[in-house]
Amino acid sequence: MSQTKCSSPSGQNGGGGNLTWWQLSLMGIGCTIGTGYFLGSSIGIMMTGPSIVISFVLAALGTYIVFNVLAKMTAEDPQKGSFCAYAKKAFGHWAGFSCGWNYWLSNILVMGSQLTALSILSRFWFEQVPLWVFASGYAILAIIVVLTGTDGFDKVENILAVVKVAAILMFIIIAGATLLGWLDGDVKKPGLPDSTGDFFHDGFPGFWSSLIYAFYAFGGIEVIGLMAMQLKKKEDGPKAGKVMMFVLAAIYVVSMGLAVTMVFQGAFDDKESPFVTALDDYHLPFFPHVFNGAIIIAGFSTMTASLFGVTKLLCTMSEDGDAPLLFSKKTKKLKDLPLASLGLGAAGLLASIITALLMPGKIYEYITTAAGILLLYNWLFIIISSLKVLKQKIWSKVFSVVGLLLILASISGTLAEKTIRPGFYVSILLAVIIGIVAFFMRKVWKRTETS
């Protein structure tokens, strides 16, 4: 079997790619819109009511700051390891190692929960089919997409992005029609909130706790950081990020705003998409089926993006000495795919599925909540790394600090809600375990540097 190292064809980190900025923007939208938005946002609405719109605005701002500094670092110093390479450059080997394995572990856990959600949603049509059959089918499909290589992944994500945006626009159009009185329903609309109590349903604690779910809806930008290496012009990264975040923020805020003005806060259910809930009483028999399909597509898309991301990053980590050399081998017959890296990701995915199906529901919820928080820890590292790596003007640094504060607010907000508080503690435990491994790896790194 012919194999090569996990390097770009040119052998340089800064080698030219074939993506235009708008393709990266579209891919970013595809990799971001997922179950966190279509399903998780219901929990945020239940916690804070109409003020979830403000939560999404703040999350969009925080996410834009993260992507903007990541794109700037990529344009200035293109690295295949993306945020891990910049953390290593800023703080040393331990930081790159910790970021990489933190990203790998959190994504594997999140993918397991996504597969479980997709399987449950699929039983909307096929009640008798066991969950494990759907989970296995979606996992195999995701692996096939990754096996098609970067070009195949790009095409699939771009197509799915269009489908997801179309579904959201369909909701916005239908919701607008109901508010204008063009569609009749058996429900009294709450309309715009006329008091602070109506807007912030559970006061500041509820709003604070809802931030984490707004940030979850923007999860996935790390993959775009990795894909930014494929841009024809690396300096177009910030432009791609601005367009991506503007589109995401616009459709998120408008759709959320419409949903919370159509039905009362008590109608929302954490097991149902808020958009389906909003149109439940408008006699649209096709809508639950269409939107259920859209949610499945969204979840599959983000899960595939995560699998692609962990496969790509583990390959680079192997080259940097942060994973066994086996994972840096690429197979020419399979479009230069790091097969061992994909295999480990698939094995982790299988373990995560089994855990999701066998473990008591609440315990697994804590683990998946922790996985989402771990991803935000990486976002913190991205911003902190940029403060050391980039030469920025004072206002750019202030902007970065604002991003730090927003992410810290979302993470700490989990302490204000007892149902998700254990997830915060689990995230600390997992981060400490990664830190301990990094501490003991110092001897290995010293030996490597000496030799």
Task: Enumerate the predicted regions with their spans.
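Membrane-interface loop-to-helix entry segments
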Residues: 132-190, 241-246, 372-381, 392-403, ...
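Membrane-helix boundary/coupling elements in multi-pass transport proteins
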Residues: 102-115, 225, 229-230, 288-325, ...
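Helix-loop-helix junctions that connect adjacent transmembrane segments
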Residues: 3, 9-15, 127-130, 161-293, ...
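A generic transmembrane alpha-helix motif of multi-pass inner-membrane proteins
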Residues: 178, 371, 375, 384-451
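TM-loop-TM module centered on a large, flexible mid-protein loop between adjacent transmembrane helices
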Residues: 85-87, 92, 124, 243-304, ...
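Helix-loop-helix connectors at the membrane interface of multi-pass transporters/channels
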Residues: 2-3, 8-10, 85-88, 115-135, ...
